[in-house]
């Protein structure tokens, strides 16, 4: 018998921060094929307030021959609607984190821009993160962006 199928998902949640309230956290959960949790969701990184992903594809349409490289970036809904899931070569993701202590001396932040790739005309971009409260506008923010190549897709060309 083989191992059961499982989906690992990451999401932004809040956890209790004792008497000071709550703190944002990047959480991880394993979901079994039958829809049950493998274990309780676990916090991975405190301070995470946003995450986004774009998918590097080899041509934005099946009408064009594959090149063996990444020619465009797409959102997942664009990948699905164009039926090019087999052409996804990488996942480019961004995680926005913030400090846990607000300081009135910090400059007011109305938006946190996230650098986006620009390979082809019409490529989507990451959406800036917008602080939701006055206190959040006085936090300091960091954007972490990384790209992960999908090995089987690259070598299976």
Which ranges hold each PLM region?
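Short linear sequence signals and composition-biased patches located at protein termini or domain-edge surfaces
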Residues: 2-5, 14-20, 32-157
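Extracellular protease catalytic domains of secreted zymogens
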Residues: 28
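Short, surface-exposed charged micro-motifs
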Residues: 9-11
């Amino acid at each position: 018998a083989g191992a059961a199928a499982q989906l690992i998902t990451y999401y932004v949640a809040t956890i209790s921060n004792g008497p000071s309230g709550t703190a944002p956290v990047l959480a991880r959960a394993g979901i079994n094929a039958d829809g049950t949790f493998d274990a309780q969701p676990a916090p991975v990184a405190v301070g995470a307030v946003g995450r986004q992903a774009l998918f590097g594809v080899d041509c934005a349409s099946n009408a064009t021959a594959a090149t063996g490289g990444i020619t465009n970036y797409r959102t997942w809904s664009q990948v699905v609607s164009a039926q090019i899931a087999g052409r996804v070569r990488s996942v480019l993701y961004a995680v926005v984190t913030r400090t846990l202590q607000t300081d009135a001396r910090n400059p007011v932040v109305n938006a946190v821009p996230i650098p986006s790739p620009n390979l082809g005309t019409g490529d989507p971009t990451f959406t800036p993160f917008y602080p939701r409260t006055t206190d959040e506008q006085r936090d300091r923010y960091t954007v972490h962006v990384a790209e992960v190549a999908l090995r089987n897709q690259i070598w299976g060309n």
